[in-house]
């Protein structure tokens, strides 16, 4: 029996020794794997830095593009980087001021309203589209030859110092270098209300599409100038009823706004015979602009008398002859 059990015991001893060796080798074997956070941390830091640098670079490029687009775009949405000069030179335009020069403004005809009051075509008074006041005899006007719109000289001079278009019809006013004034501003014959051609209808329709004209047409032109006229505001030059109409436009009982009439535009148009406008374009402008309240801007004693003498000089000249011919 002893001999029969010996192989079994030997087998058990061998298994025990193998397990013991495996256990001892497992206890003495060093750990070579590092914690996950230690192995991943050195690889994540460069990736985060690169991502931040790329985001910063992309944001900087986008900001530069926006700033460049904003600084090189005019208020009307057109690029104002450069413009071609008369001799092929590139001249940089002023981005702060888009108006006309003083010499160009003074080249437009300037005269007293009393000089042409008896020669104008049509009935009713003419008003300045900027201050919305009717012209008086002693006021100095300035005529825009391309569209025949007239304004107070003091009002339109301020407007053209920052803009280069007509306040009513947005016609371009700056002359091209080297061009003749007569060829640049061809005088258009005054339209007849009873026989209006297609060209005038199209031009008037394009004018009515201007937002500024629609705003002005909301005002009522039936105000009678008399003793009951509200006083004008010193800050805006508008009377109280005009400011009320501007803020709260009138409407019909159905709730629809009043449709602007084409005839309202004639309040801003000084319609003169072609010969009169030609003489105004060649006539020298008055040396000093006369205000409706303070006389000439110089403020010196006797300036008002000189203005009346200048008016008399022009009135007794070619304009009086034209009046006699028309009568």
Curated annotation (Swiss-Prot):
GO biological process annotations for this chain's record?
A: protein ubiquitination
Q: Where are the transmembrane segments?
A: 47-67
Catalyzes what? S-ubiquitinyl-[E2 ubiquitin-conjugating enzyme]-L-cysteine + [acceptor protein]-L-lysine = [E2 ubiquitin-conjugating enzyme]-L-cysteine + N(6)-ubiquitinyl-[acceptor protein]-L-lysine
GO terms under cellular component: membrane
Q: Which residues form the signal peptide?
A: 1-26
Cite the residue ranges of zinc fingers (RING-type). 128-170
* UniProt comment concerning the protein's domains: The RING-type zinc finger domain mediates binding to an E2 ubiquitin-conjugating enzyme.
Q: Indicate what this protein is called per its UniProt record.
A: RING-H2 finger protein ATL34
Which species is this record about?
Answer: Arabidopsis thaliana
| Lineage of source species | Eukaryota, Viridiplantae, Streptophyta, Embryophyta, Tracheophyta
Gene that encodes the chain: ATL34
């Amino acid at each position: 029996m002893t001999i029969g059990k010996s192989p079994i015991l030997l087998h058990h001893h061998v298994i025990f020794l193998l397990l013991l060796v495996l256990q001892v080798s497992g206890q003495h074997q060093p750990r070579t794997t590092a914690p996950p956070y230690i192995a991943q941390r050195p690889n994540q830091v460069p990736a985060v830095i690169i991502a931040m640098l790329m985001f910063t670079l992309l944001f900087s490029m986008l900001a530069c593009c926006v700033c460049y687009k904003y600084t090189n775009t005019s208020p009307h949405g057109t690029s104002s980087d450069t413009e071609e000069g008369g001799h092929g030179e590139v001249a940089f335009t002023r981005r702060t001021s888009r108006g006309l020069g003083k010499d160009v403004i003074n080249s437009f005809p300037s005269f007293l309203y009393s000089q042409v009051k008896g020669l104008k075509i049509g009935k009713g008074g003419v008003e300045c589209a900027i201050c919305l006041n009717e012209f008086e005899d002693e006021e100095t006007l300035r005529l825009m030859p391309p569209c025949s719109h007239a304004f107070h000289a003091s009002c339109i001079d301020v407007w053209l110092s920052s803009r280069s278009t007509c306040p009513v019809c947005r016609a371009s006013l700056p002359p091209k270098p080297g061009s003749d004034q007569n060829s640049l501003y061809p005088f258009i014959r005054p339209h007849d209300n009873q026989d209006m051609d297609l060209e005038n209808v199209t031009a008037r329709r394009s004018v009515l599409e201007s937002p500024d004209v629609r705003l002005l047409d909301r005002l009522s032109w039936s105000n009678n100038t008399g003793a009951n006229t509200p006083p004008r505001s010193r800050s805006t030059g508008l009377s109280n009823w005009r400011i009320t109409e501007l803020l709260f436009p009138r409407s019909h009982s159905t709730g629809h706004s009043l449709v602007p009439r084409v005839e309202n535009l004639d309040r801003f148009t000084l319609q003169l015979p072609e010969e009169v406008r030609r003489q105004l374009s060649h006539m020298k402008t008055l040396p000093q602009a006369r205000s409706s309240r303070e006389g000439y801007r110089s403020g010196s004693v006797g300036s008002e008398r000189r203005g009346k003498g200048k008016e008399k000089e022009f009135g007794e000249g070619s304009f009086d002859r034209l009046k006699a011919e028309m009568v």
